[in-house]
Regions:
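Catalytic-core signature of thiol
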Residues: 1-235
Length: 235
């Protein structure tokens, strides 16, 4: 049984557009950001948001090692962000992003609105947290480990994008290493774009440190990697 649990974010005019962080062109056409542990497993819980946050931290270029328990804890922190502790009805990508910022995982997050922004980020900067509808056909990658959004909609799901080759994007979901290849799969650019335009979301953030969500929030100052990362982004 695969758990889902992504809710659509409500509009917020304060959101940063990812386009504001793209300042240069690139000739890179292929990139797969390393994910060096077994994919985490949310089991049949609606905790995909918390697990996507954990996967985002695990994935290069600035990896932090998180566990299944971290994924569950991050989900509960999302509930705390929304003022609904203990709720088991999923979470939104914006709440995931706000929670990561509150916990000190990143200081900046921005929403992509176009495929060109998503592709640029995957090829040059790192992975993105995404939220889309998940259809019944997507539960079964084909012989080439490609998923297809066919069949009825099973629900909303948060997952990670961590790679790009011509015509395809690579994703990782939080159903353990037995789904696809270590939780990973490919989806065509065309089919991902169709999902994205059906209330899909994609968020990029700048990681700053490993965070254990079970530890009380540190209200003090911290030295982060944000400055170097922003300098790299804007050239």
């Amino acid at each position: 049984m695969y758990g889902l649990g992504r809710n659509v974010s409500t509009f917020d005019r304060r959101d940063y557009p990812l386009s504001a962080f793209i300042r240069r062109t690139t000739d890179v056409t292929e990139k797969l950001w390393a994910f060096e542990v077994d994919a985490l497993n949310q089991l049949d819980t609606p905790h995909c948001g918390g697990f996507t946050m954990a996967h985002y931290g695990i994935c290069h270029p600035m990896p932090s090692m998180y566990t299944n328990q971290n994924g569950h804890d991050f989900y509960e922190q999302c509930n705390i962000t929304d003022g609904t502790p203990g709720l088991q009805s999923g979470t939104s990508c914006r709440t995931m992003a706000k929670t990561g910022k509150r916990l000190g995982m990143w200081s900046v997050y921005a929403f992509a609105t176009r495929m060109a922004e998503i592709d640029y980020w995957l090829l040059n900067e790192g992975s993105l947290m995404v939220g889309t509808e998940w259809t019944m056909g997507m539960f079964a990658p084909d012989a080439n480990n490609i998923i297809h959004p066919t069949g009825s909609i099973a629900g909303g799901h948060a997952w990670l994008l961590n790679g790009k080759i011509p015509g395809f994007k690579h994703g990782i979901t939080s159903w353990g290493p037995d789904f696809g290849i270590n939780g990973g799969f490919w989806i065509s650019d065309t089919e991902f774009e169709a999902l994205f335009h059906q209330q899909g979301e994609a968020i990029a953030a700048v990681e700053v440190a490993k965070v254990d969500p079970s530890v009380p929030e540190n209200k003090g100052c911290a030295t982060t990697k944000l400055g170097k990362a922003l300098k790299r982004m804007i050239g």
